[in-house]
Amino acid sequence: MIKDYRNTMLQKLLGFNPKTMTLRTESIAGITTFLTMSYILAVNTSILSSTGMDKGAVFTATALATALSTLLLAFMAKLPLAQAPSMGINAFFAFTLVQGMGYPWQVAMAALFVEGLLFILITFFNVREIVLNSIPATLRYAISVGIGMFIAFIGLKNAGIIVSDPATFVTFGPFTPVSVLALTGILLSGLLVVKQVKGALFYSILICTLIGIPLGVTTIPEGFLPISTPHSLAPTFYQFDFSQLFTLDMAVIIFTLLFFDMFDTIRTFVALDRESTPLNSPH
């Protein structure tokens, strides 16, 4: 009787179907999903903190945004999906807007905030769906590849595997502990993914972190505690600078962010559409 009541509650709250699902399977799937995407906590923090944003605040914000958006998907849409900050738009924000164009991160955050509001509007009025349906399948895959290559290029540059060159634009960098460790991580991640190891990226990050300690790449902060209270959001919370909002340059930036965000979302839809069927059926 208790089991029936539990299944009924889970069915109402999360769309749990006791005929095709078990609590054990769903729990393991949830843990596996966490292990697979937990690298975003470290990567997003590293990318955004390179702009001068407080690292602790960014880490806390990333964790909270991921948890809240995933819970909303579970309870409101009843979809077994996890959501986290995009690994494309954060790189564009940090390396193009802030480091490339020289905008303070507060100004770039204001542009991103306005873009987010516009993105909600075009989603509400089904503009995004119209755009998605009008794009040929081949172009959808090309968008996915293009954004993926952009992220990969930034990763290779940050690791020192490639460096700038006046003649060829980029060339291979020197062998350093950082670049060797990065190459090891890439090969290890690829191997574990091919072997279909659950949590492949998580284990790759963990192993490379441990290898990096004797190499001097990984440093353990003084007074490090494995469990601690979350860092405050205050250094970055609502730190928007709207002083340059009503300028032509900012309008172009907001449009570019909107364009980038839309196609980054399309990239995600294409990937999910190939792996699951609930997105193809009305909900």
Predicted regions and their residues:
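Histidine-centered active-site/metal-ligand motif
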Residues: 283
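Structural signal for membrane-spanning alpha-helices in multi-pass inner-membrane proteins
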Residues: 73-74, 119, 123, 189, ...
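Hydrophobic mid-bilayer segments of alpha-helices in multi-pass membrane transport proteins
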Residues: 87, 112-114, 143, 179-187, ...
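Early transmembrane hairpin of solute transport permeases
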Residues: 28-175
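Transmembrane alpha-helix interface/packing and boundary motifs in multi-pass membrane proteins
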Residues: 69-82, 190-196, 257-264
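Entry/N-cap segments of selected transmembrane alpha helices
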Residues: 159-182, 186-193, 246-257
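Transmembrane helix interruption/hinge and helix-loop junction motifs
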Residues: 102-106, 195-200
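Helix-loop-helix hairpins and the membrane-proximal interhelical loops
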Residues: 2-57, 170-171, 203-279
